Curated annotation (Swiss-Prot):
Positions of the UniProt region annotated as Disordered: 1-229, 278-317, 339-371, 420-459, 490-520
Family: Belongs to the GYP5 family.
Compositional bias (Acidic residues): 62-78, 219-229
Keyword Membrane: yes
Protein's job: GTPase-activating protein involved in ER to Golgi trafficking and polarized exocytosis.
Residue ranges with Basic and acidic residues bias: 1-32, 195-217
Biological processes annotated in GO: endoplasmic reticulum to Golgi vesicle-mediated transport; exocytosis; protein transport
Record InterPro entries: Rab-GAP-TBC_dom, Rab-GAP_TBC_sf, Rab_GAP_TBC_domain
GO cellular component term, pick one: plasma membrane
Organism the protein comes from: Schizosaccharomyces pombe (strain 972 / ATCC 24843) (Fission yeast)
Protein's name in the database: GTPase activating protein Gyp51
Regions that span the bilayer: 798-818
UniProtKB keywords: Cytoplasm, ER-Golgi transport, Exocytosis, GTPase activation, Membrane, Protein transport, Transmembrane, Transmembrane helix, Transport
Gene3D superfamilies reported in the protein's UniProt record: putative rabgap domain of human tbc1 domain family member 14 like domains, Ypt/Rab-GAP domain of gyp1p, domain 3
Amino acid sequence: MAFTEANEREVQSSYEKENVKIIREEEAKDQESTDDIAVEDGTGTSPDLNFFSTQNVMQMNFEDEYSEFSNEDDEAEIDNSFADSIPNEPEIPDMQDEYSRDSHSQQSVEEQNNTTNTDEDASVNEFSVAADISDVNTLGKDNSESTEEPVNEVNETATLGNEDVGERSGFPSEGLDNEPESQRDLDETGNLAPEDLKDEVKSVHEFNEPNDLRQQEESYSDDDDTNVNEFEDVNEIENEHQLSVADEDQTSRLVKGKMIFVGKEDFGEEADISNSVFIEQNGPNSDTVSGFKETSSIVNSSSTTEKPGVALDSQNDTSIFNEEQTNSLTETFNDLTLDHLPENVESEPVAGKENETAKNESGASDNDHKANVHVFVLKSSEDAITLNEEKIATQDDPLEAPTPIVASSSTIFLNSNQRNDELSASGSQEPHPKDGTNSTSSLPLDTNNLSNSEPPSHVLDASSETIEVIQTIKKLQNQVPETIKDEVGKKNTAFSPGTSLSTNHVKTKSRSAHNNSTSPFSTAVSSWLNPLRYPSDKSPRVISSYLESVFISKPRSIGDAQKLEILEYLQSQSSTVSNQVFTLLSNFIQNPLFVLDECFDEFRNLILMHNSHTVHTVVWKTISSWTSYDYEMQYSSLSIKNCDSDKAIRKDLDRTFAPEILSHFFSNRQQLEPTDNIAESTANLHRVLRSLAIVLPQVGYTQGMSWIAGALLMHLPAPQAFALLVFLFKNYHLQNIFSSEMRGLSRVLHQFTRLVEDYMPSLAIHFKRQDIKTCSYASEWFLTLFAYKFPLEVVAHLYDILFLYGPGILFNFGLALLSHSQESLLKLNMDRLISYLKEDIFLAFKETQEGENYDTSLFVKTAFSFEIQPDVLDRYGNEYDILLKSEHELDSSLEEMRNRHKSLNEHFIMLSDSMANLQVEHENMSALLLKEKMYLKNQTVEQASLKSEIASLNSQLAKQKSEIEQAFQGDMEAIIAENLEIMVESQSLEDEIFRKEKQLAETKVNLAVLDEDHMMALQKWSQLMNRIKTK
C-alpha cells in the first residue's frame, strides 16, 4: 500500500522522511529517468520496504480483515499493535522510537485512519500489497521448504522488541515485495519461497549497510527535485545514520545471544512489561528459517487475548502455531523446572491455534522443524536476562565430560589471606561436603528460595573460588536430562531436620542411579551441595562429604601391609559389630573414596548412630593411614627430639587429666599391657604433643591440644594418633585457632556469637544484659573440640562426625548445647550463669540424673536441627575480618596518637620548665627595673641641683676672669717687651753659631785632603822600601 502526493501531505513528517529515503535509494542505484518521475510524483517505493513502516500497515482496512472489532477504541488499539503481529517486517530496530518522538504522530495516525476507506482503491491500484493479512501470518508456519535455509542474517533482524526497558523498539521481520501476488513465487502453503525470502532479507541488510547510507547522502546532495525541504532532509540523514548504528549494535547482540524478544511495542519509562516474554531457540533446527518463523510468530497479545505472554487471534483463519509446533512448545515447557529459572522469573506455557491445512501441506518431519522454545515471563525490569542457546540433552544423548566439580570446604578457621595461601599450596580447590555442614541463614529461614541454580557461597572469604564453582554447577545443571532431574526430589529422611533418628536409610546406588540424599541438618542447602549424578562414565565425581574432599585433594594409596594391619584389628573386633558394619568398614579400609562416593548414606548413618569403640578405631586408623602415613613413619624420630615447648607441655599435663583418664591414653583399653602405667601414658601423651610442636613450629603448644591428643590416644596408638592430630591441624585448619595471637579462635567466637543472635536472640540478649562474653564459656569448647567436659567416649563420637562433615559442624555442636539448655540459662544470673555454662550445660544431655551415660543421639539430632548456611558464615567471618582490620587501624591510629601525645607532653614539660625559668627571670628583671627607676629619679634631683651649682660657678668664673685681666694687664706689657729683646739676642747668637759651623766644615775638608796626601806618601814610601829590599 502506498500514498499519493495528496495523502503524503497529510502524513506525519516521519513517513515523509521514509519516502524520501526510498526515492534516493532508487536514484543512487538506477539513475533512470523513470525513477526521477517517480520521485517527483512522490509514489516511488522500494520493493524491499513495502511494509517498512507501521504507518503502512495501519493504512489497511481492518474492518475487512477483522470484522469482529467494531468499537472505535478497539480499532485504535489494533492500529498501535497490529504491526507487532507482522512476523517478518524488516524494520530497523528503534525506528518506532523515532516515530514515537514525532509530535504529530498521533494526529497523523487519526487522519490516516479517517482517510483509509476513501483512498484504499486508489492506493491499491498504484502500489499493490505482496500478500494479504493471512499471507503475512502464514509466514510463521513455513515448515518444509524453508527448514534448510540458513538464517544467520534473519536472526540479526528477527527482533520483535527491545530488551532495554524504557525504550521503544521496532519490529523487524522479512520484507515483502510490492509486486502483485500473482507475480510472486509462492510455495505450496501460500508462503514465500525460501529463495525469495532469503533475497528479501539480503536486500534489507544491503539497504542497512553504511555504504548504502553514504550513497544516499551523496545522492541527497545532487537531489534538486525533492518535494521535502532541505531542513527536513538533513535531519532525515542524521536520524537514518543513528538508526543504522543502533540497528547494527542490537542485531549483533541478538546474534550472539541467539534470542528473540517478544513484547509490547511501547516501552515507555513507566511501561508495564509484565506481559513481555523472552523466547530462546534451543531446537536442533534453530538456525533455520523455519526455526525463525516459529519463534517470530509469537507476538504480544495485550489487545487480543487475556493470557499474558501469548498472542492469539481467535477469530482469524490463520493460527500462529500449527499443532506440531504447539505440542513441541507445550512439551518443552512442561519439562522445564524452576531450577532453570531465577527466583523472580516464572515460566508461562505458549499455546497456539491448530492449523490442520498448514500441517498437512508442510510435509516435514518433527525433527526437521521442531524447536524447543523457552518462554520466560518478566516480572520486573531487572529480570531482563539473556538466555544463551544450550541444547537440553535427552537420556540417550551422552553428556560431554565437564570439568570435575570440586566444591570448596567451609574453612571456618581461615581468613582471606590464609585461604589464598592454602589454595596456592594445595594447587586445587578445597572440596565442600555435600551435606552442607555449614549452611546457615539468618532467621527466619526461607528454604523456598534456594535452588540448584543458586548455590550459596560456601567459603568464608570474598577471595574464594565460589564464582567459578557456581558457573560450573549452572553449566552442568543446564545439561541435565529431565528424567534425572526428577530424581532430585528423592531424599533420605533418616536424619532430616525435625525427624527422629532411625536406622532407616536409602542405599546409595551407582552413578547411573543417583539418589539425592538430604543433609542431616540442612535441607535447604543440600539440594545444591548434593550435585546431580549423570548416567555416564564421563560424569564428574560428586563430593559427598568434607572427608571425601580431603581424600580427593590429596590422592594417595597405602600399602597392603597397612590395610592388613587395620583389617586384622577389625577381624579381632568382629564380634562387637554387625556383619553389615563389618563389610562397610572393610570396604572403607580398602578404598575410602569408593565408600564415601557410592555408599555414603550407609557410612553416614553408621558414623551418626554407632556406639562401638571398634568403629572409632577403624575409621581413625584408616584416615590416618590414607592421609598421614608419612607422619606415622616420622613419629619415632620426632618423639625423641627436644623442643622449646617441653616445659609447658609437662606443666599442663600434670594439671589437666586425672590419673584414671591418663591410663586410657596408651592406645585403647584392649591393648593395655600389665606393664603399662600412668607414667607411661603421660609420657606417651607428652611425646605426641612434643612431636606436633616440632612439626608445626608456628603453632607450638597451646593449652587445649592435650585434650584433643588425649581423645585420639584413647583409640589409636601413639604414631597414628600423632599422624591424625597433624591431619586435623593441617587439613581441618585447627592451627589457626591455636596460633600465637588466637586470631582464628576470635574469628570463630565472633561467628558463633552472631549465630547465637540469629537462632536464640532471647538468649543472646540475656547474655548481653548479664555481660557474658562468648569467650568466657565457648573458648574451651573450640580449643578442646568439646572434649573439656564431655566424657571421652562421647567426644570420640563427636570426632567421628567432625571428620566426616568438617570443622563447620563445631558450630552446630555449640548451638546444640545452648539450645537444649536455653530455658535454664534464661533463668540464671551472671555468677550462676558462668558456672552453668562451664560445668552443668553438658549434664543436660545425660540419660538420667544419677547415671553416667549421655544421650549422644539427642545431642547429634539437636546439632543437626540448625541450618547454618555458608554464606552467612562467610558474612560473619568477613565481618570479623573487617572489624579486626578496623581494630588494627584504630590501634595503629591510637599508637600513633599515643606517640604524638608523648612527644607533645615532653615538649610541654620542656616549655613549662622554660616558662618557669622565664618567670623567675622576669621577676628579677622587674625588681631591677624598679630599682633603676628609683635611682633614676634620685639622679634627676641631683642633676637639677648640680645644674644650679654649675650656673653659679660659671658666673663666678667669668667675674674672676675679668678681675684677673684687669690686674695683670700692665705686667703683661713689660713681659712682652722683655721677651722681644730676648728674641733679638737669641737671633744674633744663632748667626754666630752658623758662622762657626761653616768654618769647622772647611777645616774638616782640609784635613781630609791632608790625610789623602799622607796616604799617598806612605804608599810611595812603601814601594821604595820594597824596591830597596828587592835590590
